[in-house]
Amino acid sequence: MLLTADDIRQLNDKIQYQSAFIDRLRDETARVIIGQHHMLDRLLIGLLSNGHVLLEGVPGLAKTLTIKSLSQAIHAKFSRIQFTPDLLPADVIGTMIYNQQKNEFVVRRGPIFANFILADEINRAPAKVQSALLEAMQERQVTLGDSTYKLDEPFLVLATQNPLEQEGTYPLPEAQQDRFIMKVIIDYPTKQEEQIIIRQNVQSLKSPEVSQVVSMQEITQAKDLTRQIYMDEKVENYILDIVFATRFPEKYKLEKLKPLIAYGGSPRASINLALAAKAHAFLNKRGFVIPEDVRSISKDVLRHRLGLTYEAEAENVNVENIIDDVLRVIQVP
Protein backbone atom coordinates (compact mmCIF):
# COMPACT_ATOMS: atom_id res chain seq x y z
CA MET A 1 0.00 0.00 0.00
CA LEU A 2 1.38 3.41 -1.02
CA LEU A 3 1.43 6.05 1.70
CA THR A 4 1.10 9.77 1.12
CA ALA A 5 3.46 12.28 2.74
CA ASP A 6 0.64 13.12 5.18
CA ASP A 7 0.19 9.42 6.08
CA ILE A 8 3.92 9.08 6.79
CA ARG A 9 3.86 12.25 8.92
CA GLN A 10 0.95 10.91 10.99
CA LEU A 11 2.68 7.53 11.37
CA ASN A 12 5.86 9.29 12.44
CA ASP A 13 4.00 11.27 15.13
CA LYS A 14 2.28 8.12 16.35
CA ILE A 15 5.58 6.23 16.64
CA GLN A 16 7.27 9.12 18.45
CA TYR A 17 4.49 8.91 21.04
CA GLN A 18 4.29 5.09 21.24
CA SER A 19 8.07 4.61 21.45
CA ALA A 20 8.43 6.77 24.58
CA PHE A 21 8.73 3.60 26.69
CA ILE A 22 12.10 2.80 25.05
CA ASP A 23 13.78 5.58 27.08
CA ARG A 24 12.16 4.33 30.30
CA LEU A 25 13.32 0.80 29.52
CA ARG A 26 16.90 1.86 28.79
CA ASP A 27 17.09 4.06 31.91
CA GLU A 28 15.73 1.33 34.19
CA THR A 29 18.00 -1.44 32.90
CA ALA A 30 21.00 0.94 33.02
CA ARG A 31 20.64 0.95 36.82
CA VAL A 32 21.78 -2.69 36.79
CA ILE A 33 23.64 -3.16 33.50
CA ILE A 34 26.71 -1.01 32.98
CA GLY A 35 27.46 -0.51 29.29
CA GLN A 36 26.37 -3.20 26.79
CA HIS A 37 24.05 -0.72 25.05
CA HIS A 38 24.57 -2.53 21.75
CA MET A 39 23.42 -5.87 23.21
CA LEU A 40 20.31 -4.33 24.82
CA ASP A 41 19.34 -2.54 21.60
CA ARG A 42 19.77 -5.76 19.61
CA LEU A 43 17.54 -7.63 22.08
CA LEU A 44 14.90 -4.92 21.68
CA ILE A 45 15.18 -5.20 17.89
CA GLY A 46 14.68 -8.97 18.18
CA LEU A 47 11.67 -8.41 20.43
CA LEU A 48 10.05 -5.79 18.17
CA SER A 49 10.64 -7.77 14.98
CA ASN A 50 9.40 -11.06 16.49
CA GLY A 51 12.79 -12.70 16.00
CA HIS A 52 15.40 -14.43 18.17
CA VAL A 53 18.99 -13.46 18.86
CA LEU A 54 22.20 -15.49 18.90
CA LEU A 55 24.92 -14.00 21.11
CA GLU A 56 28.59 -14.86 20.95
CA GLY A 57 30.94 -13.73 23.69
CA VAL A 58 33.15 -14.93 26.51
CA PRO A 59 31.56 -15.65 29.93
CA GLY A 60 31.00 -12.78 32.34
CA LEU A 61 29.74 -10.11 29.93
CA ALA A 62 26.27 -9.73 31.56
CA LYS A 63 24.32 -11.75 28.97
CA THR A 64 22.13 -13.41 31.63
CA LEU A 65 21.75 -10.19 33.61
CA THR A 66 20.70 -8.22 30.53
CA ILE A 67 17.86 -10.48 29.41
CA LYS A 68 16.75 -11.05 33.02
CA SER A 69 16.65 -7.29 33.67
CA LEU A 70 14.73 -6.75 30.42
CA SER A 71 12.12 -9.34 31.44
CA GLN A 72 11.76 -7.71 34.90
CA ALA A 73 11.30 -4.26 33.35
CA ILE A 74 8.43 -5.69 31.26
CA HIS A 75 7.17 -7.96 34.06
CA ALA A 76 7.54 -10.97 31.78
CA LYS A 77 8.35 -14.56 32.70
CA PHE A 78 12.06 -15.38 32.44
CA SER A 79 13.56 -18.85 32.04
CA ARG A 80 17.18 -19.96 31.78
CA ILE A 81 18.19 -23.28 30.19
CA GLN A 82 21.78 -24.39 30.70
CA PHE A 83 22.61 -26.59 27.72
CA THR A 84 24.77 -29.62 28.52
CA PRO A 85 25.70 -32.80 26.58
CA ASP A 86 23.28 -34.93 28.65
CA LEU A 87 20.27 -32.65 28.11
CA LEU A 88 17.16 -34.23 26.53
CA PRO A 89 14.45 -32.58 24.40
CA ALA A 90 11.95 -33.21 27.22
CA ASP A 91 14.14 -31.09 29.53
CA VAL A 92 13.49 -28.14 27.22
CA ILE A 93 9.94 -28.47 25.92
CA GLY A 94 8.40 -30.69 28.62
CA THR A 95 6.87 -34.15 28.63
CA MET A 96 3.90 -36.28 29.66
CA ILE A 97 4.20 -37.86 33.11
CA TYR A 98 1.97 -40.50 34.67
CA ASN A 99 -0.12 -39.41 37.66
CA GLN A 100 -0.82 -42.49 39.77
CA GLN A 101 -3.50 -40.78 41.87
CA LYS A 102 -5.49 -39.68 38.82
CA ASN A 103 -4.51 -42.77 36.81
CA GLU A 104 -3.72 -40.65 33.75
CA PHE A 105 -0.90 -38.86 31.96
CA VAL A 106 -0.54 -35.16 32.71
CA VAL A 107 1.53 -32.48 31.01
CA ARG A 108 4.67 -31.18 32.66
CA ARG A 109 5.66 -28.02 30.82
CA GLY A 110 9.32 -27.34 30.20
CA PRO A 111 11.22 -24.07 30.63
CA ILE A 112 10.42 -23.13 27.02
CA PHE A 113 7.05 -21.91 28.35
CA ALA A 114 8.22 -18.40 29.21
CA ASN A 115 8.40 -14.99 27.54
CA PHE A 116 12.17 -14.51 27.68
CA ILE A 117 14.41 -17.56 27.44
CA LEU A 118 18.16 -17.67 27.82
CA ALA A 119 19.47 -20.76 26.02
CA ASP A 120 22.93 -20.72 27.59
CA GLU A 121 25.75 -22.36 25.60
CA ILE A 122 23.38 -23.81 23.02
CA ASN A 123 26.31 -25.46 21.21
CA ARG A 124 26.93 -27.79 24.19
CA ALA A 125 23.74 -29.80 23.64
CA PRO A 126 23.27 -32.59 21.06
CA ALA A 127 21.62 -31.84 17.73
CA LYS A 128 18.24 -33.35 18.73
CA VAL A 129 17.97 -30.92 21.68
CA GLN A 130 19.00 -27.95 19.54
CA SER A 131 16.43 -29.03 16.97
CA ALA A 132 13.65 -29.23 19.60
CA LEU A 133 14.38 -25.68 20.74
CA LEU A 134 14.69 -24.26 17.22
CA GLU A 135 11.47 -25.92 16.10
CA ALA A 136 9.63 -24.38 19.05
CA MET A 137 11.18 -21.01 18.18
CA GLN A 138 10.00 -21.27 14.59
CA GLU A 139 6.53 -22.68 15.17
CA ARG A 140 5.91 -20.83 18.47
CA GLN A 141 4.12 -23.90 19.72
CA VAL A 142 4.99 -27.24 21.30
CA THR A 143 3.33 -30.65 20.85
CA LEU A 144 3.17 -32.84 23.96
CA GLY A 145 1.30 -36.12 23.56
CA ASP A 146 -1.74 -35.50 21.37
CA SER A 147 -2.09 -31.83 22.23
CA THR A 148 -0.43 -28.71 20.85
CA TYR A 149 0.31 -25.80 23.18
CA LYS A 150 0.88 -22.24 21.99
CA LEU A 151 3.86 -20.48 23.54
CA ASP A 152 3.33 -17.23 25.40
CA GLU A 153 3.70 -13.84 23.70
CA PRO A 154 5.97 -11.97 23.66
CA PHE A 155 8.43 -14.80 23.04
CA LEU A 156 12.14 -14.06 22.71
CA VAL A 157 14.96 -16.62 22.77
CA LEU A 158 18.47 -15.41 23.45
CA ALA A 159 20.92 -18.21 22.67
CA THR A 160 24.57 -17.88 23.67
CA GLN A 161 27.76 -19.45 22.35
CA ASN A 162 31.26 -19.32 23.81
CA PRO A 163 33.71 -18.60 20.96
CA LEU A 164 36.73 -19.95 22.85
CA GLU A 165 35.82 -23.47 23.94
CA GLN A 166 35.35 -25.96 21.12
CA GLU A 167 35.85 -29.28 22.93
CA GLY A 168 32.62 -31.09 23.73
CA THR A 169 30.52 -28.76 21.60
CA TYR A 170 28.02 -29.38 18.80
CA PRO A 171 28.26 -26.38 16.44
CA LEU A 172 24.92 -25.08 15.19
CA PRO A 173 24.44 -25.99 11.51
CA GLU A 174 24.12 -23.08 9.09
CA ALA A 175 20.45 -23.88 8.47
CA GLN A 176 19.73 -23.64 12.20
CA GLN A 177 21.71 -20.43 12.65
CA ASP A 178 19.68 -18.90 9.82
CA ARG A 179 16.60 -19.01 12.08
CA PHE A 180 18.05 -16.30 14.31
CA ILE A 181 17.33 -12.79 13.10
CA MET A 182 20.74 -11.65 14.33
CA LYS A 183 24.06 -12.95 15.56
CA VAL A 184 25.57 -10.38 17.90
CA ILE A 185 29.20 -10.35 18.99
CA ILE A 186 29.52 -9.13 22.58
CA ASP A 187 32.64 -7.16 23.42
CA TYR A 188 34.31 -6.29 26.71
CA PRO A 189 33.19 -3.15 28.60
CA THR A 190 35.36 -0.04 28.45
CA LYS A 191 37.83 0.69 31.24
CA GLN A 192 35.51 3.35 32.71
CA GLU A 193 32.50 1.00 32.57
CA GLU A 194 34.43 -1.80 34.23
CA GLN A 195 35.49 0.57 37.02
CA ILE A 196 31.81 1.29 37.74
CA ILE A 197 31.07 -2.47 37.64
CA ILE A 198 33.82 -3.10 40.23
CA ARG A 199 32.48 -0.41 42.56
CA GLN A 200 28.90 -1.59 42.18
CA ASN A 201 29.80 -5.19 43.04
CA VAL A 202 32.35 -4.49 45.79
CA GLN A 203 30.46 -1.83 47.75
CA SER A 204 27.15 -3.68 48.01
CA LEU A 205 26.17 -7.30 48.47
CA LYS A 206 22.76 -6.65 46.95
CA SER A 207 22.31 -5.75 43.28
CA PRO A 208 19.85 -2.97 42.40
CA GLU A 209 16.34 -4.21 41.66
CA VAL A 210 14.74 -3.61 38.27
CA SER A 211 11.18 -2.32 38.44
CA GLN A 212 8.46 -2.74 35.85
CA VAL A 213 8.36 0.34 33.62
CA VAL A 214 6.61 -1.11 30.55
CA SER A 215 3.48 -3.22 30.20
CA MET A 216 3.07 -6.29 28.02
CA GLN A 217 0.32 -4.42 26.17
CA GLU A 218 2.77 -1.64 25.23
CA ILE A 219 5.20 -4.23 23.85
CA THR A 220 2.44 -5.90 21.80
CA GLN A 221 1.31 -2.54 20.40
CA ALA A 222 4.92 -1.62 19.59
CA LYS A 223 5.42 -4.91 17.69
CA ASP A 224 2.28 -4.26 15.62
CA LEU A 225 3.32 -0.67 14.97
CA THR A 226 6.85 -1.68 13.93
CA ARG A 227 5.39 -3.67 11.02
CA GLN A 228 3.58 -0.54 9.80
CA ILE A 229 6.75 1.57 9.56
CA TYR A 230 7.15 2.91 6.04
CA MET A 231 9.92 1.54 3.85
CA ASP A 232 10.48 3.24 0.51
CA GLU A 233 11.06 1.12 -2.59
CA LYS A 234 14.56 2.63 -2.86
CA VAL A 235 15.43 1.25 0.59
CA GLU A 236 13.96 -2.14 -0.36
CA ASN A 237 16.19 -2.19 -3.44
CA TYR A 238 19.16 -1.19 -1.28
CA ILE A 239 18.52 -4.25 0.92
CA LEU A 240 18.19 -6.49 -2.15
CA ASP A 241 21.42 -5.14 -3.64
CA ILE A 242 23.31 -5.86 -0.41
CA VAL A 243 22.06 -9.46 -0.24
CA PHE A 244 22.47 -10.12 -3.97
CA ALA A 245 26.03 -8.78 -3.82
CA THR A 246 26.84 -11.59 -1.36
CA ARG A 247 25.49 -14.13 -3.88
CA PHE A 248 26.79 -12.67 -7.13
CA PRO A 249 29.66 -10.33 -6.18
CA GLU A 250 30.95 -10.20 -9.77
CA LYS A 251 27.74 -8.39 -10.84
CA TYR A 252 28.49 -5.58 -8.38
CA LYS A 253 32.15 -4.98 -9.31
CA LEU A 254 33.26 -7.17 -6.41
CA GLU A 255 35.03 -9.85 -8.46
CA LYS A 256 37.71 -10.25 -5.77
CA LEU A 257 35.04 -11.58 -3.35
CA LYS A 258 33.81 -14.39 -5.63
CA PRO A 259 36.53 -16.94 -4.63
CA LEU A 260 36.10 -15.99 -0.96
CA ILE A 261 32.33 -16.57 -0.59
CA ALA A 262 31.07 -20.16 -0.50
CA TYR A 263 27.42 -19.09 -0.31
CA GLY A 264 25.59 -15.79 0.13
CA GLY A 265 22.55 -14.69 2.07
CA SER A 266 19.23 -16.50 1.54
CA PRO A 267 15.87 -14.73 1.04
CA ARG A 268 15.55 -14.95 4.83
CA ALA A 269 18.50 -12.53 4.98
CA SER A 270 16.54 -9.97 2.94
CA ILE A 271 13.42 -10.43 5.07
CA ASN A 272 15.33 -10.09 8.34
CA LEU A 273 17.27 -7.05 7.12
CA ALA A 274 13.94 -5.36 6.39
CA LEU A 275 12.38 -6.39 9.72
CA ALA A 276 15.42 -5.39 11.78
CA ALA A 277 15.73 -2.07 9.92
CA LYS A 278 12.11 -1.25 10.78
CA ALA A 279 12.72 -2.12 14.44
CA HIS A 280 15.87 0.04 14.40
CA ALA A 281 13.79 2.93 13.05
CA PHE A 282 11.28 2.40 15.89
CA LEU A 283 14.09 2.55 18.48
CA ASN A 284 15.07 5.88 16.91
CA LYS A 285 11.45 7.09 17.09
CA ARG A 286 10.91 7.27 13.33
CA GLY A 287 7.97 6.14 11.25
CA PHE A 288 10.11 5.46 8.20
CA VAL A 289 13.27 3.50 7.39
CA ILE A 290 16.42 5.25 6.18
CA PRO A 291 19.51 3.58 4.64
CA GLU A 292 21.43 4.15 7.90
CA ASP A 293 19.00 1.77 9.66
CA VAL A 294 19.95 -0.94 7.17
CA ARG A 295 23.67 -0.25 7.47
CA SER A 296 23.54 -0.23 11.29
CA ILE A 297 22.09 -3.73 11.57
CA SER A 298 23.60 -5.33 8.45
CA LYS A 299 26.57 -7.03 10.15
CA ASP A 300 24.43 -8.50 12.94
CA VAL A 301 21.85 -9.79 10.44
CA LEU A 302 24.31 -11.14 7.85
CA ARG A 303 27.37 -12.44 9.72
CA HIS A 304 25.88 -15.91 10.37
CA ARG A 305 24.28 -16.21 6.91
CA LEU A 306 27.40 -16.08 4.75
CA GLY A 307 29.75 -19.00 4.20
CA LEU A 308 33.43 -18.45 3.49
CA THR A 309 35.77 -20.65 1.45
CA TYR A 310 39.08 -22.14 2.59
CA GLU A 311 40.73 -19.49 0.46
CA ALA A 312 39.15 -16.77 2.62
CA GLU A 313 40.44 -18.46 5.77
CA ALA A 314 43.91 -18.77 4.23
CA GLU A 315 43.88 -15.05 3.45
CA ASN A 316 42.60 -14.17 6.96
CA VAL A 317 39.40 -12.71 5.54
CA ASN A 318 36.38 -12.83 7.86
CA VAL A 319 32.67 -12.22 7.30
CA GLU A 320 32.90 -8.67 8.63
CA ASN A 321 35.48 -7.85 5.94
CA ILE A 322 33.13 -9.18 3.25
CA ILE A 323 30.17 -7.14 4.57
CA ASP A 324 32.33 -4.00 4.80
CA ASP A 325 33.35 -4.41 1.15
CA VAL A 326 29.73 -4.90 0.08
CA LEU A 327 28.50 -1.84 2.02
CA ARG A 328 31.31 0.27 0.60
CA VAL A 329 30.45 -0.59 -3.01
CA ILE A 330 26.63 -0.67 -2.96
CA GLN A 331 25.31 2.80 -3.68
CA VAL A 332 23.31 4.35 -0.84
CA PRO A 333 19.94 5.70 -2.09
Regions found by a protein language model. Give the residues of each.
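Pre-Walker A (pre-P-loop) alpha-helix and adjacent loop at the N terminus of AAA/AAA+ ATPase modules
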Residues: I15-L61, F244
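Walker A/P-loop
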Residues: L47-T84
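Short glycine-rich substrate-engagement loop in P-loop NTPases that contacts/grips substrate
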Residues: L87-F116
